[in-house]
Amino acid sequence: MQNRTIAAIATAPGAGGIAVVRLSGPESYAVAARVFRPANPNKRVEDAKGYTALFGKFLEGEDAFDEGVALFFRAPHSYTGEDVVELSCHGGSAVARRLVESCIEAGAAPAAPGEYTRRAFLNGKLSLTQAEAVMDIISADGRQGAALANASLSGALAKKIAAEKESLTALQAHLAAWVDFPEEDVPELDEAHLQTVLGGVKDELDTLIQNYDAGAVLREGVDCAIVGRPNAGKSTLLNLLAGFDRAIVTPVAGTTRDVVEQAVRLGDIRLNLFDTAGLRDTEDLIEAEGIRRSWKKLDEAGLVLAVFDGSAPLTREDFELARKCAGRPAIALINKEDKPTQFDVEIIAPYFAMVLPVCCQEEGTRKLISSAVARLLGTNQIDPHAASLSGQRQLAAATRAREAVAGALAAAAGGFGLDAVSVCVDDALDALCDLTGENASEAVINEVFERFCVGK
């Protein structure tokens, strides 16, 4: 499969200034020579050096149908590690598709989803964590999320894991020498040294794991349920955060009967907002179904904005909502602070991570909530240039490694002998190799690259 030369559109679909068709494989230059004629008759595609460009016309047979630029990369100095030619044509979809068809007629094969990055991984140009970062940086729609992905693409995570593996490998070599060659004069490792090395690795893994949720919020966004009694100001809040009138707002209680969805950017976090039906007792079947969905969204959400009417006394529904929010990442918004307060905040405050007095009709509320959400979800503590875990695969591998290191520490402290410590260190090293992809099975590799689209 990897011996074939592949072609695909590498740019996003739709009209644009340019489109890029990428060739990769041993016959890239030969295929390019059949579909591209340099404007300078003294230039030949086959002779082009790496990191050079030629202007010319794109051909279908002998007929020119567009003009543009060919960029040349010689193996191994390319994205995939193979000979690569990138053909930049005008950005109309029809032109780009025709250029791909010409490349296929000239001997290239259609690229599979993620095949370019897969080849980069298999050819040693990227680690598996760097390959995953390619997808993260493509998907990123916030500055911090893009910075985290770029740090991983630049090798921050791979270098961090390599350093921890180096510490464990050196320790394991000493353990193996002492266990396997007891007759030799190998000094036994003292517990203090074991605690220092293993404790240091465990601390680094703990930091990566603890920062995972905040990093995931920056990369992927978070589902946020807006809940509260009728007329507390939920839909007004949704409209404020969205920046336009997304939901109908009236003085009539029960106006919102179904879940209203809207994605918004709050600071550097994408919130998938769900404005829900007002929570109250009702005999209306339609409204009751909306309220059932409100509770369901609260249970599913990664963030809850509970809106209370600060101008009215606390009700049974308010207290029930507060109890439901206990232990969740939830912020109580005491709305209508521009009116005399009748609400007893002290009763509900213990159930929330934060309590904010707000006015959902004032623009300053948006900034206030943005800051509170960043603090609650920990995104304000993230160093966007530091190593970070991305995706459940990396988290699971890091967690296995951390548990194995903790097991080694427990074995050393419990006097179970260096054999037991050595087994745990082996398990930790295996987990770290799984994380970086050194031990990755074909199934794991397939799972990583199936998220990619054609051309990446």
Label for each model-derived stretch:
Residues 271, 303, 331:
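Short, Asp-centered acidic motifs that coordinate Mg2+ and/or phosphate
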Residues 1-147, 151, 155, 331:
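A glycine-rich (often HGG/GG-containing) alpha/beta subdomain
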Residues 287-311:
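Inter-motif core of Ras-like GTPase G domains
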Residues 55-65, 70-74, 254-282, 300:
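Switch I (G2) and immediately adjacent beta-strands of P-loop GTPase domains
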Residues 2-9, 13, 143-265, 282, ...:
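C-terminal-of-GTPase-core extension/linker across diverse P-loop GTPases
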Residues 242, 277-278, 302, 309, ...:
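Short glycine-/small-residue-rich Rossmann-like dinucleotide-binding loops
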Residues 273, 307, 333:
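Generic enzyme active-site microenvironment
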